[in-house]
Regions:
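Short acidic-hydrophobic, aromatic-tinged amphipathic segments that line or gate anion-handling sites
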Residues: 2-9
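Phosphate/ribose-recognition catalytic cores of enzymes acting on nucleotide-derived substrates
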Residues: 197-312
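ATP-dependent adenylation/nucleotidyltransferase module used to activate substrates
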Residues: 81-82
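Glycine-rich, highly charged phosphate/nucleotide-binding loops
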Residues: 69-77, 101-107
């Protein structure tokens, strides 16, 4: 897959393409459904397939007080897009100037003149251009004027629900990780660096790695204890473990922390990059009467996870 950053200029060797455009947060199954049509059509027509996306969420530019909670920061999004088999990803720098372009000018100046889009697939509910004021019928008319075919992709439904980034975020925010996995098409993941923690887990017999997220805009699941798989650094192995998200109420904590205990692992993780894939939520976080009572519950949590993962 070739990645192009438009603010650095547009390559002169771009061929005519079949393309689609969007922010693609999560690259969920609805996105995958749309992109599969782009890739298949491009192959049938002997053209390159292209995804056009943005380096930041448009609302970050349009609303100064907006704080995004992303399913996938840019680099992870590019990794997931590469897995779809698309030929080219063009990353646009979304700024105030770009937000002022009408749909017509966006299609003419960027899609036609710079990216050589011959056929454009539009998601069933997607709009672009200044204030998102125009819709699919307008895009078709502009495309006809420019010699660009515009096609609307059908909706992708799962159990009667339109799969969208909003739906995926709602599941993650509620700790509904199995539902999130069904919508995303893969287990939700977060990554970061292991930093010094409180050492409380080690004293209880459950040493934990305290994770500092690589991107603070990342959406964090609801507080609770989760069954997870963990990858350390560049290792290919995903190890089973459990993660606590919350304020550590048994120890009087107030700030939310992300702590993961990896089963059957005794290595030193400080400074390492780790990635956590969420399988399911085991229970909510709660305050225990003593550290010993918490340790007993953690032992039960671990057994619950081992039993469930051995059966699944």
């Amino acid at each position: 897959m070739r990645t192009i950053y438009l603010q650095k200029g547009c390559p002169a060797d771009l061929a005519a393409s079949v393309a689609t455009i969007g922010f693609f947060d999560g690259v969920h199954r609805g996105h995958q459904f749309l992109i599969s049509h782009v890739v298949e059509t491009a192959r049938e027509e002997g053209r390159q397939s292209m995804i056009i996306t943005f380096d930041q969420h448009p609302r970050e530019v349009l609303h100064a007080d907006y704080q995004p909670r992303l399913l996938t920061p840019l680099q992870e999004k590019l990794y997931l897009l590469e897995r779809t088999g698309v030929d080219v990803v063009a990353v646009l720098h979304f700024d105030a100037a770009l937000s002022q372009l009408s749909a017509h000018d966006f299609m003419h100046d960027l899609l036609q003149e710079r990216l050589h889009v011959a056929k454009l697939f539009i998601g069933y509910d997607h709009r672009f251009g200044h204030n998102r004021a125009e819709g699919f019928a307008d895009y078709v008319a502009y495309g006809r004027e420019m010699g660009m075919e515009v096609v609307q992709n059908p909706v992708f439904e799962l159990e009667g629900v339109n799969v969208s980034s909003t739906v995926c975020r709602r599941h993650v925010a509620a700790g509904e990780m199995e539902a999130a996995s069904r919508c995303l098409g893969y287990p939700y993941r977060m990554g970061g660096r292991v930093v010094a923690g409180f050492q409380e887990g080690r004293k209880l017999g459950f040493p934990t790695a305290n994770i500092q997220l690589a991107d603070p805009r990342r959406l964090v699941p609801a507080s609770g204890v989760y069954a997870v798989r963990v990858k350390v650094g560049d290792e290919a192995t995903w190890r089973l473990g459990m993660m606590n998200i919350g304020t550590r109420p048994t120890f009087g904590g107030e700030k939310v922390s992300l702590e993961v205990h990896i089963f059957d692992f005794a290595g030193d993780l400080y400074g390492c990059q780790v990635e956590v894939a969420f399988l399911r939520r085991v229970r909510e976080e709660r305050k225990f009467a003593s550290p010993e009572e918490l340790a007993a519950q953690l032992a039960r949590d671990k057994q619950t996870i081992l039993d469930a993962c051995c059966l699944s």
